[in-house]
Structure formats: C-alpha cells, structure tokens
C-alpha cells in the first residue's frame, strides 16, 4: 500500500516521528565497521556530486545534479531514506514529510526566518552553531564535511565532530521562492512542456532545469539551499535534516508536473550519446560508491525508467497548490 507524504507543518505526529527517526538513524549501524546509516546518505550525496559525467568534462554535470537525472536520482535517495526511517521507527506506514517552502516564500524576508518550520518543536532555527530545536548543539552532531586535502584543490570528505550550522536568509536573494514562481516553473512552455533538452546541463531548456534552479529567475531548489545556508551549502548538505524536507517538496512538485501534463516522457533516452552516462532513461543510478561499498543502502540496480511512476510507493497529501 502506498504511504502518504504530508506537509510537516500540518501534522505534529509526522513531524515528531521524523525528528525521532533521523536521530535514530544517527545511532543505527548496518555493520559495525560502517558509518551510521544517516551519515552514509551524506557520503552518497557527496560522491554523486564529485563524479563528473562524463569524467573531466566542462559541462559541470555530475552523477546526480546539473543534468536530467537530478530528479530521479533524488527520488530514489528519498525512497531509500524513507525505507530506513520506516525500519527504525517500526512503522511501515510512515511517509517522509515535506516542507512547502514556497508557502513561506509569501512572507516577508524577516518573517521567513521566523516561520513555523524553524520553531523549537520543529527544525529549530539559525546559528553557527544552531542553538535551538531538536538539532541544536549537544543534540545533533555533524561527523563528516566537505573539505580539502592539503596541497589539492579537489574537495574531499573530512571527519569532524561539531554542531550543525545554518545561516537563514543570509544568501542572495535573501528570500525563498514563492508559489507563483513555482507555478510558473511547472507551467513553463505549456501545453508543449518538455522534461529536459540538449545540452543536458545547466543551460538546458525544460522543467528539470527550472526546478533544479540554474536559469536566471527564482532558482527554486538551488535557492532553498542557499537561503538555509550553513551545512545546506556544500555537497554534504544532507548533514542538515531540512535537506530531506526540501527535496521531498521538490519531488512533490515533479509529481504534480507529471500529473498535470500526463507524464511527459523522460529524456534523454537510451540511444543518446555515451557522454550522457548516468543520465539516460535506462542508465543505472549512481550507487553509494562506484564499487557499491554500501550496497545495502543502494538496494539494487535502479534506473530512471523505474522511478517515473511512484503511485504504488507513495502519494502526496496535496498537489492543488501547483
């Protein structure tokens, strides 16, 4: 039976379960010689961003971002994260909640930083370190972050032991996307909408790039990362539990677009250039590492084509705002 993913601000039970679940994953070890389950997802996301597609290209495209696979790759990440939350919560009906940041985008910049999502009983507030809410200093620890090896300009993972960092509203522009901006992204090009197009990167026309947030304008998903700031900025952004609420809303917007326009086809298809490996319809999604070291997280050989119809897995409580 499909679970229902709900707005975290409309259901205190789901909110409390989510907070409990992510804390349980921080102390959950699938094997004694592995990092905790929560941090494995951080590692997976980091390596996806460090894997250029194709290698050494100038496109900026990587194995999970800046190209067509952005939406299905993160959809699969959310499904797996949701599965592990269900496991540690012992609740197979638990649905990953979302944060409708476009609703907060209707507030003034000052009000956005004081919105309900940042309350003490929800995600807590801003600060370096965060000093309020369930993920404040002493209650949540960042164990790995993006850093640099001495003498090298290539980012790497660095072991740390520190509190969570946020800098709400400190980026530019200092406000979240609005409902109108999201609706405009959903309906751009209607009725002849397209998912993506050449050159299949940050310069592409199509829904994926509008939602990911590379064209000039509202910048949608990207702007949320910048607006939250702190640990939401680098490739280790899943260190902040707000990451999953943000991406669940991104997935909700994609789901709404699929329904409104009757499942426009995913492109590029399987016959596209080998330089688009990892982004084509039937390419295997990037695993936790290239050698699948953490394969129990990855759970099999999954492709974008497997993730275009999610109706048997989950639904959203509403899409009417899109």
Residue map of PLM features:
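Intrinsically disordered, flexible peripheral segments
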Residues: 1-322
């Amino acid at each position: 039976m499909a679970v229902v993913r709900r707005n975290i601000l409309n259901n205190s039970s789901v909110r409390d379960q989510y907070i409990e679940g992510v804390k349980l994953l921080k102390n959950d070890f699938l094997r004694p010689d592995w990092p905790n389950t929560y941090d494995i997802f951080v590692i997976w996301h980091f390596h996806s961003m460090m894997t250029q597609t194709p290698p050494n290209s100038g496109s900026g495209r990587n194995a999970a971002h800046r190209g067509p696979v952005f939406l299905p790759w993160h959809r699969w990440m959310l499904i797996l994260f949701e599965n592990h939350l269900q496991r540690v919560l012992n609740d197979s009906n638990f649905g990953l909640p979302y944060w409708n940041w476009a609703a907060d985008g209707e507030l003034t910049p000052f009000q956005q930083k004081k919105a309900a999502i940042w309350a003490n009983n929800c995600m807590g507030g801003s600060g370096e370190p965060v000093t309020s809410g369930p993920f404040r200093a002493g209650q949540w620890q960042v164990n790995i972050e993006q850093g640099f090896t001495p003498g090298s300009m290539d980012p790497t993972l660095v072991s740390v032991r520190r509190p969570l960092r946020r800098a709400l509203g400190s980026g530019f522009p200092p406000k979240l996307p609005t409902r109108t901006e999201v609706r405009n992204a959903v309906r751009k090009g209607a009725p002849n909408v397209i998912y993506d197009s050449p050159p299949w990167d940050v310069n592409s026309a199509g829904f994926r790039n509008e939602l990911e947030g590379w064209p000039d304008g509202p910048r949608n998903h990207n702007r949320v990362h910048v607006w939250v700031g702190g640990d939401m900025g680098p490739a280790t952004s899943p260190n902040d539990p707000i990451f999953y609420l943000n991406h669940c809303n991104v997935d909700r917007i994609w789901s709404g677009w699929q329904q409104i326009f009757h499942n426009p086809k995913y492109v590029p298809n399987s016959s596209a250039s080998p330089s688009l490996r990892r982004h084509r319809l039937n390419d295997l999604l990037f695993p936790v590492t290239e050698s699948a070291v953490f394969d129990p997280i990855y759970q099999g050989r999954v492709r974008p084509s497997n993730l275009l119809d999610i109706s048997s897995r989950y639904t959203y409580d509403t899409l009417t705002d899109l």
